[in-house]
Curated annotation (Swiss-Prot):
The modification Phosphoserine is found at residues 346, 348. One of its GO terms (biological process) is regulation of postsynapse assembly. This is Leucine zipper putative tumor suppressor 3. Belongs to the LZTS3 family. InterPro entries: LZTS (IPR045329). Residues 348-526, 600-669 form a coiled coil. Keywords: Cell projection, Coiled coil, Cytoplasm, Cytoskeleton, Phosphoprotein, Synapse. It holds the Pfam family Fez1. Detected in brain, with highest expression in brain cortex, caudate putamen, cerebellum and hippocampus. Detected in neuropil (at protein level). Detected in brain and kidney. Residues 205-218 have a biased composition (Polar residues). Interacts (via C-terminus) with SHANK3 (via PDZ domain). Interacts (via coiled coil) with SIPA1L1. Can form homooligomers. It is found in: Synapse; Postsynaptic density; Cell projection, Dendritic spine; Cell projection, Dendrite. Residues 290-299, 325-336 have a biased composition (Gly residues).
Length: 703
C-alpha cells in the first residue's frame, strides 16, 4: 500500500501490523515512524564554502534540534552511542537567517527529479507516515560531486532514480495513522511504546581529529541558528514494510543509517552501499572558499543525525545524534575564507573511522534485535491478556445474548399468541360484518323497490291530485258564493221575521180589540134584546109616521171598503180600527140620540163591519203568501243560474289547462325534432300525460 493511500485512509480501528516483526500486535499500541530530512541551504550558496575550518568548540545544541524517538516498548533498554559523520552546508545567507523547510537529499550529481519520476512511491509502507515538510526542488552539487541542498544536506548515494524512503508528495500532507484500541482490561502495567521523546545529542569526537579546529573570529554560538537547524526532526518507531517483508531503519537522509540494512526476520534485505559515509569523509579534506557577497554567513556545517528511536525504553529512550561541527564560519564583513583551510585525512584514519561506524551500526543492530525480542514478548503477553479478556467478554456477551434471546423468544411467542387471538377475533368480526353487510344490502334492495313503487304511485297520484285540487277550488268557490247568498237570505229572513213579529203584534192587538168588540157585541146584543123587547112594546104605542126608513151606516161602509182594498194592511187595520171606533161612536151617539130605536140598526152595522174586516184580513194574508211564494221562486231561479255559471267557469278552466298541456307537449316535440335537449325528468318524477276528465256532475250545497 502506498504512503499516499495510507495517508488518505485516515485513522483505522483495527489495522494489525505485519507479523514478521512483532507477531500479533494488539490494537491498543500506537506505532509511529518519524524520519528526518536534511536541511538544505540556499540554492545560490557557493559549494566551496564546505572547506572552511570548523570551530574549536561547539555551542549548546539548539532546542529545535532535539529529535524525538519512538521506543520499542522495552523497559530498561540499553542505551548505546552512535557516531555518524555527515557533511552539510550551513544555511548561511547574507544576514545569517534560518534555512528553509527541510527536505531529503538523494545521492546524485544532478538535480532532484520531479515527483512523477520516482516509481518507488507506490511501495507498500504499512503503518508508516512521514512528518517532514515539502520538497524543495533547488539542489546543486559541491566540489566533491555530491548533491547539496539549500541547507547543506548532501546525498549519500549517486545515480539512483528512486526516491528516498522519506520522500513524500507535496499534495499529501503529513498525517498520523493510528490503530485504535485500549489496554483497559490489563491489570498489570503494560509496556507501551513512547513516541517523540527528547534525545540528548552527542558530538562526534572522532571527526574532530580529522581536521584541526580553526576559528575565524566568530564562535558557533554567534553564527546564528541557521547552521544548527539541519534535519533534526521527530522520529517514529520502526514499523514493518507491509507485504514486502523487509523493514528498514529510517534516517534523516544524510547519514549512513540509510546505507545499512535494518533487522529483518527474513534476512532478505541487502546492504546498501556505503557511499554516503565515504563521500562525507572525502569532502572534509576538500578546500573551500567563501562567497564574496554574503556578510556574516556561516560556513560549511556537518550535522549528522541518526534515527535511534528503535532502542528507547518505557522510562526514557536515548538516541545518538551527531554533533554539529562547523568547518568554518564566514567573517562579519565581505571578507572571504582562505582556500586551503585544512589538509585531507589519511586513508588509515578514514578506514578507522569507517570501522568505528560499522561497529556502532552492529551495536545498534544488536540493540534493536534485543529491543525487538523484548517488545515481541511484551506484545505477546499483552495479546494473551487481551485475548483472555476478550474471551471472558465474549463468554459474558454470549451468556447475556442467550438470556436476551430467550426473553425475546418468549416475548415473541406471547406476541404471536396474542396476534393469533387478535386474528381469530378479527376473522369473526369480519364474518359478522360480512353477514351484516349482506343483510343491509338486502334491506337496501327492498327499500329501493319500495321507493320505486312509492315514486310510481306518486306519479299516478299527480293527475288525481290536480283534479282534486280543481274540485276543491270549485267547491270552495261554490261555498263562498253560497255563503254570500246565505248572508243575503238571512238578511231577508230577518227582515221578514221582523215584519212577521210586527204583524203578530198587530194581530194580537186586533184580536184583543176583536175580543173587546165581541164582548161589546155580546153586551150590545143583550142590551139589544132588552131594548128590542122594550121597542116592541113601544112600537105598539108609537104612530106609523115615525117608522120611516132611515140611512143605515152599512150604506156608508160599502164605498169605504172599496177604497180600503187599495190600501196596505196596516193602513187598512188603522182605518178599520178608526172606522170601528167611529162606528162605535156613531152607534153610541145613535143610541144616545135615537134612544132605543136606532140601537138595533147600529149593532147590525157594527157586525157587518167586523165581518168585512175579517174578510179583508183573510185576503191580505192570501196576498202575502202569494208574494212569499213569488220571491222564493225568483231566488231559486237565480241560484240555478249561479250554479250553471260556476259549472261553465270550471269547464272553461279545465279546457284551458288541457290546451296548455297540449301546447307544452307540442313545444317539447318540436324542440326534440330541432335537436335541442330538454332535461329529462328523473325516476319517480315523470309527469304522465294529463287525460281530460269530464266533470259529469257538480253538486252544490242547497240552503
Amino acid at each position: 500500500m502506498a504512503p499516499a493511500d495510507l495517508a488518505s485512509e485516515g485513522p483505522k480501528l483495527e489495522d494489525p501490523p505485519a507479523p514478521h516483526l512483532f507477531g500479533k500486535c494488539p490494537s491498543g499500541l500506537i506505532m509511529a515512524n518519524v524520519e528526518t530530512l536534511p536541511v538544505r541551504a540556499d540554492p545560490g550558496r557557493d559549494p566551496l564554502l564546505a572547506f572552511a575550518p570548523r570551530p574549536a568548540e561547539l555551542g549548546p545544541p539548539d532546542p529545535r534540534l532535539t529529535m524525538g524517538s519512538v521506543g520499542g516498548g522495552v523497559t530498561h533498554a540499553q542505551e548505546f552511542p552512535m557516531k555518524s559523520v555527515g557533511t552539510r552546508t550551513g544555511g548561511g545567507g547574507s544576514q545569517g537567517s534560518f534555512p528553509g523547510p527541510r527536505s531529503s537529499g538523494s545521492g546524485t550529481n544532478r538535480e532532484r527529479p520531479g515527483p512523477g519520476r520516482y516509481p518507488s512511491e507506490d511501495k507498500v509502507l504499512a503503518n508508516s507516515l512521514y512528518l517532514n515538510g515539502e520538497l524543495r526542488g533547488s539542489d546543486h552539487t559541491d566540489v566533491c560531486g555530491n548533491v547539496v541542498g539549500s541547507s547543506g544536506g548532501s546525498s549519500s548515494s549517486g545515480g539512483s532514480d528512486k526516491a528516498p524512503p522519506q520522500y513524500r508528495e507535496p499534495n499529501h500532507p503529513p498525517k498520523l495513522l493510528t490503530t485504535s484500541g485500549k489496554l483497559d482490561q490489563c491489570s498489570e502495567p503494560l509496556v507501551r511504546p513512547s513516541a517523540f521523546k527528547p534525545v540528548v545529542p552527542k558530538n562526534f569526537h572522532s571527526m574532530q581529529n580529522l581536521c584541526p579546529p580553526q576559528t575565524n573570529g566568530t564562535p558557533e554560538g554567534r553564527q546564528g541558528p541557521a547552521g544548527l537547524k539541519g534535519g533534526l526532526e521527530k522520529s517514529r518507531t520502526m514499523t514493518p514494510a507491509g507485504g514486502s517483508g523487509g523493514g528498514g531503519l529510517s534516517d534523516s537522509g544524510r547519514n549512513s543509517l540509510t546505507s545499512l540494512p535494518t533487522y529483518s526476520s527474513s534476512y532478505s534485505q541487502h546492504l546498501a552501499p556505503l557511499s554516503a559515509s565515504t563521500s562525507h569523509i572525502n569532502r572534509i579534506g576538500t578546500p573551500g572558499y567563501s562567497s564574496g557577497g554574503g556578510g556574516g554567513g556561516s560556513g560549511y556545517q556537518d550535522l549528522g543525525t541518526s534515527d535511534s528511536g528503535r532502542a528507547s525504553s518505557k522510562s526514557g529512550s536515548s538516541s545518538s545524534m551527531g554533533r554539529s561541527g562547523h568547518l568554518g564560519s564566514g567573517e562579519g564583513g565581505n571578507g572571504g575564507l582562505p582556500f586551503a583551510a585544512c589538509s585531507p585525512p589519511s586513508p588509515s584514519a578514514l578506514i578507522q573511522e569507517l570501522e568505528e561506524r560499522l561497529w556502532e551500526k552492529e551495536q545498534e543492530v544488536a540493540a534493536l534485535r534485543r529491543s525487538q525480542e523484548q517488545s515481541e514478548a511484551a506484545v505477546a503477553q499483552v495479546l494473551e491478556e487481551r485475548q483472555k479478556a476478550w474471551e471472558r467478554e465474549l463468554a459474558e456477551l454470549r451468556q447475556g445474548c442467550s438470556g436476551k434471546l430467550q426473553q425475546v423468544a418468549r416475548r415473541a411467542q406471547r406476541a404471536q399468541q396474542g396476534l393469533q387471538l387478535q386474528v381469530l377475533r378479527l376473522q369473526q368480526d369480519k364474518k359478522q360484518l360480512q353477514e351484516e353487510a349482506a343483510q343491509l344490502i338486502r334491506q337496501r334492495e327492498e327499500l329501493e323497490d319500495k321507493v320505486a313503487a312509492c315514486q310510481k304511485e306518486q306519479a299516478d297520484f299527480l293527475p288525481r291530485m290536480e283534479e282534486t285540487k280543481w274540485e276543491v277550488c270549485q267547491k270552495a268557490g261554490e261555498i263562498s258564493l253560497l255563503k254570500q247568498q246565505l248572508k243575503d237570505s238571512q238578511a231577508d229572513v230577518s227582515q221578514k221575521l221582523s215584519e212577521i213579529v210586527g204583524l203578530r203584534s198587530q194581530l194580537r192587538e186586533g184580536r184583543a180589540s176583536l175580543r173587546e168588540k165581541e164582548e161589546q157585541l155580546l153586551s150590545l146584543r143583550d142590551s139589544f134584546g132588552s131594548k128590542q123587547a122594550s121597542l116592541e112594546l113601544s112600537e105598539g104605542e108609537l104612530p106609523p109616521a115615525c117608522l120611516k126608513p132611515a140611512l143605515t151606516p152599512v150604506d156608508l161602509v160599502e164605498p169605504q171598503e172599496a177604497l180600503a182594498s187599495c190600501e196596505s194592511d196596516e193602513a187598512k187595520m188603522r182605518r178599520q180600527a178608526g172606522v170601528a171606533a167611529a162606528a162605535s161612536l156613531v152607534s153610541v151617539d145613535g143610541e144616545v140620540d135615537a134612544g132605543g130605536e136606532g140601537g138595533t140598526r147600529a149593532l147590525r152595522r157594527e157586525v157587518g163591519r167586523l165581518q168585512a174586516e175579517l174578510a179583508a184580513e183573510r185576503r191580505a194574508r192570501e196576498r202575502q203568501g202569494a208574494s212569499f211564494a213569488e220571491e222564493r221562486r225568483v231566488w231559486l231561479e237565480e241560484k240555478e243560474k249561479v250554479i250553471e255559471y260556476q259549472k261553465q267557469l270550471q269547464l272553461s278552466y279545465v279546457e284551458m289547462y288541457q290546451r296548455n298541456q297540449q301546447l307544452e307537449r307540442r313545444l317539447r316535440e318540436r324542440g326534440a325534432a330541432g335537436g335541442s335537449r330538454t332535461p329529462t325528468p328523473q325516476h319517480g318524477e315523470e309527469e304522465k300525460a294529463w287525460t281530460p276528465s269530464r266533470l259529469e256532475r257538480i253538486e252544490s250545497t242547497e240552503i
